[in-house]
């Protein structure tokens, strides 16, 4: 058993956990620890009577609820659930209550936002992102059952301090779909918050082979095309733990580097990694002579899914066939020899669909014997998508998980270690810091 230090610090309204590995040996199987797990997704309906009524009316069917993205802010952990018939709420937080399937979800901001048939609420929250101004950005695809258009796709922005809607913007049809093929499904989201006004949002259309740029300052949209967005017919078949499925999806998972302003992305049905520098978009320059797409084909030995970039420029990505999290240091040449794995587990890492890199709150530090460490941590959501698509989920098994791990621990002794960039965020003289260490053991 590996001994970990588990720290929880509270400031009345906020509690946050962080995990720090004590030894330096690489243990890929246990480098990410399970934070939450579910056999099936269930909700806090307020009472068992209301839950049974939701079941009887087909509002809730536990076999149709599949988590898709995760993020965290203070004491709130957000989970999105794709809107299928039988899904009562698409945007949720994890409650303190536990049901037979696992922790119960609560709709966010409240149940009124779950009413979607008149398009006033949230239809299907595919992806979410929280920026440095405490805003939650929500990409609502407007789709039911993953294919049926119910409403226009839209962006919603919530003030997390008040849980109030700040802005809602419908995405025009000619932006949301490929007007040549009339195909479109908006899936991945990345937010670049330069200021509270000057904020750009990048949205991937993985069926219409497009990248959409939204500028918050003037509510403008721009749709970009590139052959780097297209899926590769050679890699449409994916296999997870011996179970195969086929997809023809373009961009799946994007991540923005805070160091280089590179937006990294990969078509799901590919083994490629591409990037585009976002500085032209910041200047509202979208011409072909201004925007350059770069990358390497077949740089991975399998398809990749969700992505995230650390503050020091380490790109993390889900590796499908490997049931693993990989890494690459953007300060190194983009080639397979410079990639590595930081976590691998055949049971817990089946289809990584959500990934976030989070900063510890400024008033929270981890104390490890003689050292005070401020660090980033990673959140990973897995949902066994292969079984969802093949309709063979066993709801007596654990199917969905959120895992957590410290970034510096994950990177230790890997090819992705950044030797030239030091973490200067620690402040041992910060009298306002709360320093609480609780020993905990994990099997």
Curated annotation (Swiss-Prot):
State where the protein is found: Secreted
The induction comment states: Unlike other major royal jelly proteins, not down-regulated by the ecdysteroid 20-hydroxyecdysone (ecdysterone or 20E).
- Can you tell me which residues are glycosylated? 145, 161, 178, 321
The organs and tissues expressing this protein are described as: Found in and secreted from the hypopharyngeal glands of the worker honey bee (at protein level); expression peaks at 12 days post eclosion. Expressed in the brains of adult worker bees peaking at 12 days post eclosion (at protein level). Expressed in the spermatheca of adult queen bees (at protein level); Expression levels are higher in mated queens than in virgin queens.
What span is annotated as the signal peptide, if there is one?
1-17
* Chain segments annotated as coiled-coil in the UniProt record: none
Q: What keywords tag this UniProt record?
A: Glycoprotein, Secreted, Signal
Q: What is its main location?
A: secreted
Question: SUPFAM superfamilies, from UniProt?
Answer: NHL repeat (SSF101898)
Q: Which GO terms describe its cellular component?
A: extracellular region
Which superkingdom? Eukaryota
* Purpose: Component of royal jelly, a substance produced in the hypopharyngeal gland containing proteins, free amino acids, fatty acids, sugars and other nutrients, which is fed to developing larvae by worker nurse bees. All larvae are fed some royal jelly (also known as worker jelly) early in their development but it forms the principal source of nutrition for larvae destined to become queen bees. Produced in the spermatheca of adult queen bees, along with other major royal jelly proteins, where it may act as a nutrient supply for sperm stored by mated queens, or be involved in energy metabolism.
Q: Which family does it belong to?
A: Belongs to the major royal jelly protein family.
Q: What is this protein called?
A: Major royal jelly protein 7
What organism, scientifically named, is this protein from?
A: Apis mellifera (Honeybee)
Gene that encodes it: Mrjp7
């Amino acid at each position: 058993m590996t001994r970990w230090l588990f720290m929880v610090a509270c400031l009345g309204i906020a509690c946050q956990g962080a995990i720090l590995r004590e030894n330096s040996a690489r243990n890929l199987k246990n480098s990410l620890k399970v934070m939450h797990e579910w056999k099936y997704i269930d909700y806090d309906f307020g009472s068992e009577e209301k839950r049974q009524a939701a079941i009887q009316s087909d509002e809730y069917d536990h076999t149709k609820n599949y988590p898709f993205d995760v993020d965290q802010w203070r004491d709130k952990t957000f989970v999105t659930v794709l809107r299928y018939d039988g899904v009562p709420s698409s945007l949720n937080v994890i409650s303190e209550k536990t049901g037979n399937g696992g922790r119960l979800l609560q709709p966010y901001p409240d149940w009124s936002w779950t009413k979607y048939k008149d398009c006033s609420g949230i239809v299907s929250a595919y992806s979410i992102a929280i920026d440095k101004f405490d805003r939650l950005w929500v990409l609502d695809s407007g789709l039911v059952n993953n294919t049926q258009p119910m409403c226009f796709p839209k962006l919603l922005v919530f003030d997390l301090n008040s849980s109030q809607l700040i802005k809602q913007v419908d995405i025009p049809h000619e932006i949301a779909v490929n007007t040549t093929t009339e195909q479109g499904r908006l899936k991945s989201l990345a937010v670049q918050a330069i200021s509270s006004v000057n904020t750009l949002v990048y949205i991937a259309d993985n069926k219409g082979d497009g990248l959409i740029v939204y500028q918050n300052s003037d509510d403008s949209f721009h749709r970009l095309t590139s052959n780097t967005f297209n899926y590769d017919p050679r890699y449409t078949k994916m296999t997870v733990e011996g179970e195969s499925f086929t997809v023809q999806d373009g961009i799946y998972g994007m991540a923005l580097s805070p160091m280089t302003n590179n937006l990294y992305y990969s078509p799901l049905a590919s083994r490629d990694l591409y990037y585009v520098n976002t500085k032209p978009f910041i200047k509202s320059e979208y011409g072909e002579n201004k925007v350059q797409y770069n990358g390497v084909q077949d740089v991975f030995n399998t398809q990749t899914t969700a992505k995230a970039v650390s503050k020091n420029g380490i790109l993390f990505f889900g590796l499908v066939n490997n049931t693993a999290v990989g890494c690459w240091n953007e300060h190194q040449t983009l080639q397979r020899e410079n990639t590595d794995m930081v976590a691998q587990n055949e049971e817990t890492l089946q289809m990584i669909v959500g990934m976030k890199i989070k900063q510890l709150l400024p008033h929270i530090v981890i104390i490890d014997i003689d050292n005070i460490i401020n660090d980033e941590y990673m959140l990973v959501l897995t949902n066994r998508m292969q079984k969802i698509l093949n309709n063979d989920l066993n709801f007596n098994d654990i199917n969905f998980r959120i895992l957590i791990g410290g970034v510096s621990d994950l990177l230790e002794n890997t090819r992705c270690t950044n030797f030239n960039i030091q973490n200067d965020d620690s402040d041992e003289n910060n009298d306002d810091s709360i320093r609480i260490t609780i020993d905990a053991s994990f099997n």
